[in-house]
Each structure stands twice: as structure tokens, then as C-alpha cells.
Regions:
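Classical eukaryotic N-terminal signal peptides for Sec-dependent ER targeting/secretion
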Residues: 1-19
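C-terminal accessory segments of proteins
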Residues: 22-93, 100-106, 111-402
Length: 402
């Protein structure tokens, strides 16, 4: 799969060029957005210069590829991203990164971002008590720790376009992370039911060639934000997020209070996490009273408390893993209409699988979300559960060895 590795390298290199793809709206650029000034080129925290100055980056007009898009999608602010927000951004030089080119690109460190940074991700069940405490503490702190980003209020579909001076709100790390996952997966915010039913089909981070690549970058962003907390609270600059190896398990063996929380009380929202876990009252951002509601933004349903249903069922086993890894074609156009599983990408995500492996058509990555259920059920809320990042770091590990 050498060609796929090359493709991923090209994609990530392009992401490094224009930092608005890093997330939503950097706090430093909120003023300009509300006044329809199309420039997001902040001052560096290192030297106070725009984009860090000539050694770090420069403020330039962004170029985006032109694609033929059906007119029904043109109201979507994600089309021709990110030009509905800004047209001028910092282009960082070398390994510099960040909204103002004052950070290092992933895998690099040092004053000049020229030293390799190696992080080792490990199975959560191999962590020491101290390491496990740090992981849990970072999750809890991320609920209130400032992310440095502003989010657009999508509580209704009438005032979300950046051209209409939308309401912006500051976001904690966890709120930002959940919003970002929802923003990438939600359908277009149409203003009437008929358009929604007819055209509410877009999903930019699932059910397609983008799934593993988008989530790899997402994991890196998340890990970077947690590292920033770890530096200030624990003095740890090389924090690496653990993963959960669930291959061949018959139940969630880390759904205990030692790890990510045992089952607790039940309410009208569902089965909550045990009060003996620090995760028992984690906020469920982008809460959805009705699962997978089309044409609705993150704030439509308000906030809840995370839940898990812990459904019974075998998780994918070694034979399922071997089947996924045996598929050497990364993507096969039109495969979703085929009864045969042909590509690694779609098998990894779980829209097809080993013949006869699951009569309920629940495979690999998707199967875990279905069995855990609760907050993990849906793209809007899944990333609120700490289990999400453990699961997706493991999926990324499989992607890496493919």
C-alpha cells in the first residue's frame, strides 16, 4: 500500500500549509469574522509578529481547488472551505504550525521545530497507576480547559452562515473536539423539511475514502490539545494518548471504574456511568434527543450527560482483523453498491466485512459503536465518551500497519 502512504503524506502536507483547517475559528480571528474582514493572520506568541514574521510564515490569500458542486449544496458553508470565513491565512514555513505559525508540526519539536518528536502510544491496560491517573485527569480537565477556538452557534439553521454575522462562543477542549466531529459529519443545514429529506446526505468524515485520514488528523489535534494541558499540569511534553485493543473480546473489559467507568444509574437519557468513576458526569455536547437527526447543528439539542448501554455481543476477532488487512485496494469507487467487500477503507470503517461474520451486518469499527451505544451511538455525540479516542487510536494503529 505504498501509494496510499504517499497519498496520506500529500494530504497531511497540504493540511500543514493553511492552518484554518486546524479547527474552527482561532480566538484571535473572532473580531475579524464578526466584522466580515476576510483575514485570519494572528500575531505570534513567540515574537508578536504577523504569522511569526519572515522566518516562520507569511499571510497570503488561500487557494482552494474548484469542483463542480450541485447547486443544492452551495448554501453549505463547508463547500469551498474555508473561504466562507476568511480568504487570507498564515502559510507556515518548514515545520512550523499553528494559527500564527508559533507551534511545531506533528512529529517535530524544538525552538526551530527541527528536532524529531517521538511519541509511543500504548494499550490502556498496560499503563501504570500514575499514567492512568494522568489520562483520566486530562479527560476531566478538558471539559473546562480553554481550547483557543471559537465555535459558531448552530442552535438554529437561520443564523449560522458566516456572512450573517453568526453568534460565536468560546469552547473548552472537549466542546471543541465534539463540535469539530459533528461539524464534519452533519448534513447541510437546510431551512425546510423537504430540502433536508431530499438533499441532507453530506458527511465529510465517514462512509468514504476520507474516514481513516480525517480521523488520523483529528486524533493528532486532540492529542495536541491534551498535551498542552499535560505540560501545564504535569510538566509532561511528550504525552501520548493510549488505545484500547478490543480484538477478540466478548465484552468491554475496560468499562470498569479502574479504567473508563462501570455501568451506573439509569435515567430518561439512558444508562449513565458509575458515580465511582471521574467520568460519571461528563458533559454530552451536541446532545441529540433523537438519534442522527438530519440537518441539525451541534447546539440544536443542548447538552446532556454521557451514557453507555453496554449491549452484549462479540467484538471483531483476529479473523476479522486478518480479513481487513488482506484487502490491498484502499478504495474502490462504487463499492457501497456492491454485495462484495473489496477495499480496506470501507472494511476498516465497517460498512462491509468478512463473509458470514455477522448476520446483523455490524462490522469492525462500526460494530463497537453499535455495541457500546449510548453516547457512542452517533457521530454527533460519540467523541464525548473517553472510549471514543481509545477506540479511534486503535483504529489508527491498524491503519498504520496496513
Amino acid at each position: 500500500m505504498i501509494t496510499i502512504i504517499t497519498f496520506i503524506y500529500i494530504i497531511l502536507s497540504l493540511l500543514n500549509q493553511f492552518i484554518i483547517i486546524y479547527g474552527m475559528i482561532p480566538v484571535q480571528c473572532g473580531y475579524n469574522l464578526t466584522r466580515r474582514i476576510p483575514v485570519c493572520c494572528p500575531l505570534s506568541n513567540i515574537n508578536g509578529k504577523v504569522c511569526g514574521g519572515p522566518k516562520y510564515g507569511e499571510c497570503i490569500q488561500i487557494w482552494t481547488p474548484k469542483e463542480k458542486v450541485p447547486s443544492v449544496f452551495l448554501i453549505d458553508d463547508r463547500i469551498d472551505w474555508p473561504k466562507r470565513y476568511f480568504t487570507y491565512f498564515c502559510q507556515c514555513f518548514g515545520n512550523y504550525f499553528g494559527a500564527a505559525c508559533d507551534e511545531c508540526w506533528f512529529g517535530w519539536k524544538g525552538k526551530h521545530c527541527n528536532k524529531r518528536s517521538i511519541k509511543i502510544r500504548r494499550d490502556i491496560k498496560t499503563l501504570t497507576d500514575r499514567e492512568l491517573y494522568i489520562f483520566k485527569r486530562l479527560i476531566v480537565l478538558s471539559q473546562t480547559w480553554p481550547s483557543g477556538y471559537l465555535l459558531i452557534d448552530e442552535s438554529d439553521n437561520w443564523n449560522v452562515d458566516p456572512l450573517t454575522k453568526p453568534k460565536l462562543e468560546h469552547a473548552s477542549v472537549q466542546y471543541y473536539i465534539t463540535y469539530l466531529h459533528r461539524y464534519g459529519s452533519r448534513s447541510t443545514l437546510y431551512k425546510n423539511v423537504q430540502d433536508c429529506e431530499d438533499y441532507g446526505i453530506l458527511n465529510f468524515n465517514h462512509d468514504g475514502v476520507c474516514f481513516p485520514i480525517w480521523h488520523r488528523y483529528y486524533n493528532l489535534l486532540w492529542e495536541r490539545l491534551m498535551t498542552k494541558i499535560a505540560i501545564q499540569v504535569f510538566g509532561i511534553s511528550d504525552y501520548a494518548t493510549p488505545y484500547w485493543d478490543w480484538i477478540g473480546l466478548r465484552h468491554c473489559d475496560i468499562c470498569t471504574n479502574r479504567y473508563i467507568g462501570a455501568p451506573g444509574r439509569r435515567s430518561e437519557m439512558g444508562l449513565h456511568i458509575s458515580s465511582g468513576s471521574p467520568f460519571s458526569n461528563l458533559t454530552e455536547y451536541c446532545y441529540e434527543p433523537m438519534k442522527d437527526l438530519l440537518c441539525s447543528g451541534c447546539q440544536k439539542g443542548g447538552k446532556g450527560i454521557i451514557t453507555r448501554e453496554f449491549k452484549k455481543g462479540n467484538l471483531p476477532d483476529v479473523e476479522d482483523l486478518k480479513f481487513v488487512l488482506s484487502l490491498k485496494q484502499f478504495h474502490v469507487p462504487g463499492e457501497r453498491l456492491s454485495p462484495v467487500c473489496l477495499s480496506f477503507n470501507i472494511a476498516l470503517e465497517g460498512f462491509c466485512g468478512r463473509p458470514g461474520a455477522d448476520p446483523n451486518h455490524r462490522w469492525f469499527h462500526n460494530k463497537l459503536h453499535v455495541l457500546i451505544d449510548g453516547s457512542m451511538c452517533c457521530t454527533a455525540t460519540a467523541s464525548n465518551d473517553p472510549l471514543f479516542i481509545l477506540h479511534h487510536i486503535f483504529i489508527d494503529k491498524i491503519f498504520e500497519v496496513s
